Curated annotation (Swiss-Prot):
It is found in: Cytoplasm. The keyword Cytoplasm applies. One of its GO terms (cellular component) is cytosol. It comes from Clostridium tetani (strain Massachusetts / E88). PROSITE patterns: AA_TRNA_LIGASE_I. Its main location: cytoplasm. This is Valine--tRNA ligase. InterPro entries: aa-tRNA-synth_I_CS, aa-tRNA-synth_Ia, Anticodon_Ia_Val, M/V/L/I-tRNA-synth_anticd-bd, Rossmann-like_a/b/a_fold, tRNA-bd_arm, tRNAsynth_Ia_anticodon-bd, Val-tRNA_synth_C_sf. Disulfide bonds: none annotated. Belongs to the class-I aminoacyl-tRNA synthetase family. ValS type 1 subfamily. ATP binds at K530. Its EC number is 6.1.1.9. ValRS has two distinct active sites: one for aminoacylation and one for editing. The misactivated threonine is translocated from the active site to the editing site. The C-terminal coiled-coil domain is crucial for aminoacylation activity. A motif ('KMSKS' region) lies at residues 527-531.
Length: 880
């Protein structure tokens, strides 16, 4: 056995993945230095929440980012992929609270300080887990620069931005409608809400007019909110109610007079066309209330019970009150009917409690002014969305933006940097802890109890992680970042906020490209969730198949912005591909003769197969690089796969064997070099997708470079492109395939050689150059070239390809009837194909609407099939 083989006989990723990652860390290959002679390339990793382990969505997101980073590192950029984690305020608080409840401890009983100590312990544990998981995936991130949204320097950035916005008049405290969780007793962002289909009711209720027998019938799904009604709205164009606009109604059970107002918000076709308006407990009603200057009556406590304004229902839970109110409406004759109704109900995604829209005094950011420049940078193309269609999603939100509620009634998170003087009531907003009242000099101060929305700190991620507000070397060199890869579900909540935060605080965009990916669904297309039990743990997949196989499955065939389905069979196929590369590499290592390689390293006397594979490699380098630049990572990955499996492993390695096992020293030396160069170039193209296997092979097949991670990315070379040889070689390969298929159909074993006679349809040179390959790969005892079809023997089996007609005198080996049967099957197959093409081309819609190239391709197929059919019919005729 050749002593060049330094890799194990069988492919086992468990044997080397951990060792390889350790080698990378020790080599500091992922820790870039500020190098003014190199261009920087930066990606900040979307920080995973410290609420548990990573899922397949994280695996997809990070595989895509790692793909880009590894390519740019090999292209000579100073690449920084900055990792980190998000403190995930409410999500983490709920998790820790639930863990404590298992031991009988309650958050409120522990007190803020003791509870936060437990959360910090949790964060340390889960940050470590996330870090380990990212490394197992092969992420080439710089963990020496890892950030956490609760780090001191990030907290400093958060306070600096809050104070700046407050001083600019862009942060204020006021009453607005919020999503309120009665269980967690905090305001929530829209991102923390899930919608569940709910089987409820529409209660139709009479609202009588004051001093009249008339009434309006309204329909509501939340009768308990009647207690806070301050109007009923109708559409100004609704003929049924025009005469009632401006009149008063008596609110049932409450006996409060409320007006009938006209508002375009009301849909004439929906329900009864009359809508009860509860400004304090519905976001749409809130807007109607503002337009008509209606009173805002809050009828609930923070825990979801009815407050003192609810009269006899005071103290009841909201659903208890609902039952009591419906019963009373029925008793007093106000309930008209009850209709079953299916509708979506908003729930807190962490505790599954139904949300109560409620007016609450919170801290807000004024958004209109901040949104304008953020819209402009996308419109101008300074920031690009990939795919472009997602900029519409972005514009839709930004152009209809509301003020952002940034306060949360929680303990875990960035405490709002606001203090209140207990003596004079002054509000002090300060970067540092306030010690003395700026108005009365009192030291009797108390800090605001609330923390900031998690997204507030996340919005600063691209620059706070690089040291801002300090002017650091990293910030100057690596900002703005290049690409943000993220899911389409957080364009509103995170991407948009990073854009306006970067523009407002850095006066620069935070990134140049937003690469959007979809979500990973199960094999049936369902969203993965704990409740459905269809989630897949990426670590379990890695343990079974290796990280490279999982990465390859997630990236290959995946188009930007589209959801993907997870099939374990595809991961297994990816592992089979890795195994193929492993075995091909062992073949190359086993046969390489370093002395001959060195002797003929500058020799360019390539045979047709050498020229062909170098030309194909060159074209693939161009296609892969172009696709990466367009962020078509799935397409790039597929191109590498097709080349390495179908062209290099399946064909070139086989084509190299006659040379390597021959006697021509120079030919062997040249082919050794081609084998080596094509394999190492292929490994480099594959490296961003499958980093572990490519590194293990690379460091064992050559000695000049310590790692593939910093080796040079392959470049397109015009002089290696040879379309003529590619065409010739495709004819040879098609002919060999055809001969093999015939032999298989005829049950002729490879050991039984037979003469092959070739009539070339498109020049005979290709087939003459490939003569040796017919002998070695098609079991040819002899190869004869015919000048015309008439020279073909009558007693021969035939095969037709697009470049040749091939005849094999096999009648002493095969059954004549069997050959006729085979030819008739081929005839039927070709007739069906011709019928299909003719039908397509006779379809006017297809010819008019399909691209010209597609129509021409169909025409060419039709001509080819007709030629092949003609040849088959001739053979049938000759055998009769």
């Amino acid at each position: 056995m050749n002593d060049n083989i330094n890799i194990a006989k069988t492919y086992d990723p468990k044997e080397f993945e951990e060792r390889i990652y350790k080698m990378w860390e020790e080599g500091e290959y992922f820790t870039p230095k500020v190098d003014k002679d190199k261009k920087p390339y930066t990606i900040v990793m979307p920080p995973p929440n410290i609420t548990g382990k990573l899922h397949l969505g994280h695996a997809l997101d990070n595989s895509m980012q790692d793909f880009l980073i590894r390519v740019k590192r090999m292209q000579g950029y100073s690449t920084l992929w900055l990792p980190g984690q998000d403190h995930a305020s409410i999500a983490t608080e709920v998790k820790v609270e639930n863990e404590l409840l298992k031991t009988g401890l309650k958050k409120k009983e522990m007190g803020r300080e003791a509870f936060l100590e437990r959360v910090w312990e949790w964060s340390e544990e889960y940050r470590g887990r996330i870090r380990d998981q990212l490394k197992k995936l092969g992420s080439s991130a710089d963990f020496t620069r890892e950030s956490f949204t609760m780090d001191d320097n990030l907290d400093k950035a958060v306070r600096a931005v809050f104070v700046k916005l407050y001083e600019e008049g862009l942060i204020y405290k006021g009453n607005r409608i919020v999503n309120w969780c009665p269980k967690c007793m905090t305001a929530l962002s829209d991102a923390e809400i899930e919608y569940e289909e709910n089987y409820g009711n529409f209660w139709h209720v009479k609202y009588p007019l004051v001093d009249s027998e008339e009434y309006l019938e309204i329909a509501t799904t939340r009768p308990e909110t009647m207690l806070g009604d301050t109007a009923v709205a109708v559409n100004p164009n609704d003929e049924r109610y025009k005469h009632l606009i401006g009149k008063k109604l008596m609110l049932p059970l409450v006996n409060r007079e409320i007006p009938i107002v006209a508002d375009d918000y009301v849909d004439v076709e929906f329900g009864t066309g009359a809508v009860k308006i509860t400004p304090a407990h519905d976001p749409n009603d809130y807007e109607v209330g503002k337009r008509h200057d209606l009173e805002e009556i809050i009828i609930m406590n923070e825990n979801g019970t009815i407050n003192e304004l609810g009269g006899k229902y005071s103290g009841m839970d909201r659903y208890e009150a609902r039952k009591a109110i419906v019963e009373d409406l029925k008793k007093e004759g106000f309930l008209v009917k009850v209709k079953e109704h299916i509708h979506n109900v908003s729930c807190h995604d962490r505790c599954n409690t139904i949300i109560e829209p409620m007016i609450s005094k919170q801290w807000y950011v004024k958004m209109k002014e901040l949104a304008k420049p953020a819209i402009e940078v996308v419109k101008s193309g300074e920031i690009k969305f990939v795919p472009e269609r997602f900029d519409k999603t972005y514009f839709n939100w930004m152009e209809n933006i509301q003020d952002w509620c940034i306060s949360r009634q929680l303990w875990w998170g960035h405490r709002i940097p606001v203090w209140y003087c207990k003596d004079c009531g002054e509000t002090i907003v300060s970067l540092e802890e306030a010690k003395k009242c700026s108005k009365c000099s009192s030291e009797n101060l108390i800090q605001d109890e609330d923390v900031l929305d998690t997204w507030f700190s996340s919005a600063l991620w691209p620059f706070s992680t690089l040291g801002w507000p300090d002017k650091t070397e990293d910030l100057e060199y690596f900002y703005p970042t290049d690409v943000l890869a993220t899911g389409y579900d957080i364009i509103f909540f995170w991407v948009a906020r990073m854009i306006f935060s970067g523009l407002h605080n850095m006066k620069e965009i935070p990134f140049k490209t937003v690469l959007i990916h979809g979500i990973v669904r199960d094999s049936e297309g369902k969203k993965m969730s704990k409740s459905l039990g269809n989630g897949v743990d990426p670590l379990e997949v890695i343990d079974k198949y290796g990280a490279d196989a999982l990465r390859f499955m997630l990236i290959t065939g995946n188009a930007p912005g589209n959801d993907i389905r997870f099939y374990e069979e595809r991961v297994e196929s990816a592992r089979n591909f890795a195994n193929k590369i492993w075995n091909a590499s062992r073949y190359v290592m086993m046969n390489l003769d370093k002395n001959l390689m060195e002797k003929y390293k500058d020799c360019k006397d390539y045979n047709i197969a050498d020229t062909w594979i170098l030309s194909r490699l060159n074209e693939v380098i161009k296609e892969v690089t172009d696709n990466i630049e367009k962020f078509e990572l799935g397409m790039a990955s597929q191109k590498v796969y097709d080349f390495m499996w179908n062209e290099f492993c399946d064909w070139y390695i086989e084509l190299s064997k006659p040379v390597l096992y021959g006697e021509d020293e120079k030919a062997k030396g040249v082919t050794f070099n081609v084998l080596f160069n094509v394999l190492t170039s292929g490994l480099k193209l594959l490296h961003p997708i499958m980093p572990f296997i490519t590194e293990e092979i690379f460091i064992n097949i050559q000695e000049e470079e310590k790692t593939i991670t910093t080796s040079k990315w392959p470049e397109f070379k015009e002089e290696l492109k040879n379309e003529e040889v590619e065409k010739k070689m495709s004819h040879v390969i098609e002919a060999i395939k055809a001969i093999r298929n015939v032999r298989i159909e005829m049950d002729v074993p490879p050991s039984r050689k037979a003469k092959i006679m070739i009539y070339a349809l498109d020049g005979i040179d290709a087939f003459k150059d490939g003569k040796i390959y017919f002998e070695k790969l098609a079991s040819a005892s002899e190869v004869e070239f015919l000048n015309s079809k008439e020279e073909a023997p009558e007693n021969a089996v035939s095969a037709v390809t697009k470049g040749a007609e091939i005849y094999i005198p096999l009648f002493d080996l095969v059954d004549l009837e069997k050959e006729m049967e085979r030819l008739n099957k081929e005839r039927e197959k070709l007739e069906k194909e011709i019928e299909r093409v003719d039908k397509k081309l006779s379809n006017e819609n297809f010819v008019k609407k399909a691209p010209e190239a597609v129509v021409n391709e169909e025409k060419a197929k039709g001509e080819k099939y007709k030629e092949m059919l003609e040849a088959v019919l001739e053979r049938i005729k000759s055998l009769k």
